[in-house]
Amino acid sequence: MKPQTYLAGRIAVLLTLAIVTPAIGEEKPRSGGILTYMIPADAPPSFDGHREATYATVHAAAPYYSVLIRVNPENPASPTDFVCDLCTEMPQPTDDGRTYTFKIRDGVKFHDGSPLTAVDVAASWRKIVDPPEGVTSARQSFYIMVDKIEMPDPLTVVFRLKFPTSAFLSALADPYTWIYKKEILDRDPRWYEKNIMGSGPFKLVSYEAGQAIRGERNPYYYHKGLPYLDGIVGILAPKQATRLDAIRSDRAAIEFRGLPPSAREELVGALGDKITVQTSDWNCGLLVTPNHKKKPFDDVRVRRALTLAVDRWHGAPALSKIAIMRTVGGIVFPGSPLAATKEELEQLAGFWPDIEESRSEARRLLKDAGAEGLGFELLNRDVDQPFKYLGTWLVDEWSKVGLKVNQRVAPTGPWFESLRSGNFEVTLEGNCQSVVNPLLDVSKYQPSSVFTEQYGNFDDLAAIDLYQKMLHETDPARQRALMRTFERHTLDDQVHNITTLWWYRIVPHRSYVKGWKISPSHFLNQDLATVWLDR
């Protein structure tokens, strides 16, 4: 169906999850109604979940697709609670953890009426794990443990791994792993970039570029009784003021990504108990990525100066009052067992407790590199929260060591195109993941030859080797030691990427929206099958 012109691991993590009254209860769901929700973007860069790494694609198109397994929608904050979507039951691994056999539901249909079988599941997963030439798979590196994918019969899919790893089920539950029709993929593996045709709880009705995407209930959905809603409307709006006004005036019920503290206070103050607020720590942060192919950012001294100039420890409390950022951290989700302690962070460039000492070293490095008073352009995404807030703050921080930085913002599509083509000097980008699993989440910091969404344009065999050792390691203590080495290599020795602050998720929504629970990721739990309206 073409859009018409009218988008686990083993490691236990410590997640903070709070729900402000009125809380989600055990009420009996009601069927019917249309959910209108806001998508904080101008448009998805494409509709292909395998290719993209942005909420703009997930929030627009996830309701129209099925996946093999997913996080439990009743417990989406858990990093280990996975349930079947297209499979019939979660399998136990065999062959010493190297083989996973999934039975596929019989009778599932795509929205065009054709049957969905293991043929389609296997074809979709082969595209994700080993895409054909000219096709991008954003999270291909998540699946380097997969040896082959077999389909012994029309209702069975078998994953055979090269080695056992606790990261596999988390990777399999990634919310972008939509199941496509093999016949279409064989004809054109890029068809799904511009088209939507899945087997999810909702069927596409229309897409008006840059305006809205509309869907209706799939009457043949394979989960009995779902979805509850008759239809959905996603309104695309990059400006926060527009989205807030829509929720305040009840022209929309929710924005699933997250809003800053001021927005929460504004909505609660205006609407009282007509607003429910859900909050969570967020497996998401923004990175500064220098393009190593653009001089002088091929010089580690210049890259190191960029991170040394930034005062994270004093900046975090101030920014947390106006933006969806809160926590100082390294490359690992703060609070998880593999994350650096504050004392360990303070040993890394950019995290020193004495900002004056740090900035003095930044000035020295710039002078040694012949880059005193350097001027450059920071490419940023045209999204208020938190991209433009953080970008403006960074420009000011860098000015304190004599850097002259011009910030250029671009809409989501052109911004991604600039990243992928390497047409930038320094960019602000995200490392936002789904199920909290540090082994997978830090794969972003590998070279682009391994992780296609690494935009630094560098080669680093040492980084690849360190990551592989971590992925194969089964002892938690040794794994943590390897993570510290990998983190120091990435943020201090080479400064391939520069971490800033981790986010905090605040989702205020109309209290009549029920059946949706917050998670540490704005990518999870977005097919909307369990959402219902209490009105």
Predicted feature residues:
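Short helix-initiation/N-cap motifs at beta->coil->alpha
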Residues: 144, 197, 233-245, 258-262, ...
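Aromatic- and charge-enriched surface segment that lines or borders ligand/interaction sites
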Residues: 89-134, 158, 243-246, 296-299, ...
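Gly/Pro-rich hinge or "lid" segments in bacterial periplasmic/extracellular proteins
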Residues: 69-77, 170-227, 231, 241, ...
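N-terminal lobe/hinge region of extracytoplasmic solute-binding protein
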Residues: 38-95, 126, 195-198
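Surface-exposed binding/hinge segments that line
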Residues: 7, 103, 116, 137-183
